[in-house]
């Protein structure tokens, strides 16, 4: 007679609950231990300083000189400072910075940053390498602070992720690229290109050409621009100075322009507002928007051929011009000798004009 083995008895329910409870306690203890280690060694949570990391470490980088014509810098959250030198060599210096509960942990954090420097031909490559971090960690990450003094003949390219870039009296030409890092340039000269995703850009007293591309970062620029090109999605743009040619394109960002002198200017927005103050461009000035408003405050005397058109928006004109518009949706008129062409087009945005002494 064939025997059939009886199924084994399942583990009792109290035993299963006990095993699960013990496993949960072990996982909680591991998580708390990791949390306390990160908290004590770094001292911040989600970027909020709890003043627990009372020590930091700065490992200095000895100055090095290179005879090159181009510099390439790449990093993550690192800080890059470019300045001018009257010499013929690029000078590299800086430091690695780490943070922790005590000096030993801060030094260990700084050692997680490696600065790789290599000259290949006439190009200097500087790459900041970071040791991989845990997916979820707390505290301030270590970073490198690089300082490069550049001769005017050298070109540069700096690419960062969340790190900031600063340019001080740089006479060289080049490109700065960041994702969320900010860019500040002061007293610069030459051809400068800045590209960010969300990082803000501030340019003070630039002399030369400037090209800016950003998604949501704001731009504030002052200077004498031979060729100005700005492209944003929803970042606001504030400009002041002199322009040979200027072209600004944005979707929802507002554009504010103060002009002392210009030859040609074109501003395009989708629903961003345009505010213009100052002297009209000598040759051609064009402003086009769909739903954004256009506000013009122009210096007297007005010497221009004006062509204002709006589909459903309203026009606000000085009292002395009101009778010259047969159509409240458009105005075509020549004032003075008509040396400048001023063209403004909107779909639903309003157009307003004011003259000032």
Regions found by a protein language model. Give the residues of each.
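Acidic (Asp/Glu) and glycine-rich low-complexity loops/linkers
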Residues: 2-75, 79-160, 166-178, 184-196, ...
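Short, surface-exposed loop/turn motifs that are enriched in glycine and acidic residues
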Residues: 256, 273-276
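Conserved mixed alpha/beta core segments that line enzyme active sites in large multi-domain catalysts
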Residues: 288
């Amino acid at each position: 007679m064939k025997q059939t083995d009886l199924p084994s008895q399942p583990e009792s329910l109290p035993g299963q609950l006990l095993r699960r409870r013990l496993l949960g306690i072990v996982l909680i203890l591991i998580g708390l231990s990791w949390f306390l280690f990160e908290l004590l060694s770094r001292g911040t949570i989600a970027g909020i300083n709890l003043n627990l990391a009372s020590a930091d470490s700065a490992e200095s980088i000895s100055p090095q000189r290179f005879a090159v014509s181009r510099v390439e810098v790449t990093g993550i959250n690192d800080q890059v400072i470019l300045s001018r030198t009257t010499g013929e060599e690029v000078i590299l210096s800086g430091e690695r910075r780490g943070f922790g509960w005590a000096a030993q942990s801060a030094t260990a954090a700084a050692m997680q940053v490696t600065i790789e420097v290599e000259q290949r031909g006439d190009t200097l490559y500087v790459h900041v390498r970071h040791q991989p971090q845990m997916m979820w960690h707390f505290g301030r990450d270590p970073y490198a602070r690089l300082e490069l003094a550049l001769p005017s003949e050298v070109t540069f390219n700096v690419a960062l992720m969340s790190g900031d870039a600063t340019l001080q009296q740089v006479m060289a030409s080049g490109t700065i690229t960041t994702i969320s890092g900010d860019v500040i340039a002061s007293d610069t000269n030459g051809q400068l290109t800045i590209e960010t995703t969300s990082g803000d850009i501030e340019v003070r007293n630039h002399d030369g050409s400037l090209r800016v591309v950003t998604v949501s970062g704001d731009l504030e620029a002052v200077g004498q621009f031979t060729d100005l090109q700005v492209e944003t999605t929803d970042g606001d743009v504030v400009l002041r100075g002199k322009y040979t040619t200027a072209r600004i394109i944005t979707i929802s960002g507002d554009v504010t322009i103060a002009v002392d002198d210009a030859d040609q200017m074109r501003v395009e927005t989708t629903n961003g507002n345009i505010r213009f103050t100052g002297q009209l461009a000598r040759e051609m000035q064009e402003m086009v928007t769909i739903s954004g408003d256009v506000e013009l405050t122009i210096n007297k005397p007005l010497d221009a051929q004006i062509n204002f058109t709006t589909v459903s928006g309203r026009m606000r004109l000085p009292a002395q011009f009101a009778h010259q518009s047969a159509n409240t949706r458009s105005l075509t008129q020549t004032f003075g000798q008509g040396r400048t062409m001023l063209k403004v087009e909107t779909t639903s945005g309003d157009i307003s004009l004011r003259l000032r002494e």
